[in-house]
Amino acid sequence: MNNVPRVPADDVRASINNSAVEKDHAKLREMIVAYVRKTGNKAMACAEMTYQVELAKHQLVDPLPDDVKNKVVWRDTFWLPDEAASIYSKAQAVVSMECHSPLIALHNGTPAIYVRQPTDTCKGQMYRDFGSGDWFFEVDETSGEQLWSRLAAIQRNPAKAKSQARSIMRTVNQRQKRMVDVVRQTCRAS
């Protein structure tokens, strides 16, 4: 974060992230290769954070085989959430190593797979809490083949996957309403 002094934990987190960059992205590349070759569809590599724009190119796109790379669109600039939401709403699925893109996709009715990294905060637990456990993976406990298998299931039966995304959002909306009701009651009582 800008304007926040670094603490030793920041260096530990950065060291862990740096040591896992290739290994983690190799799993996503394996999934992308399988998706493109088996479906003939295009894939998009885009960043949720500004520092990830170049990272996506170097770690996801550049190492891909030429026959796959030709079907991968790399977003070379950072985008704002409303633009991401527009693209995600038209996507067959979203697969992300960041927490927020799957949420934006689900909100738009698009199936979304979240691949959590060990240095992410505990907020990733919310995916299991609101019913998206089938689409939640710990990067250290999964393979590119497992990611492709789950994505292939979405691709094979998009109606079922979209229904699951809507069900997840119903759960989210019910829980948000319940939370807001409790806050209102608490505010009225004070």
Identify the role of each PLM range.
Residues 1-190:
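Active-site anion-handling motifs in enzyme catalytic cores
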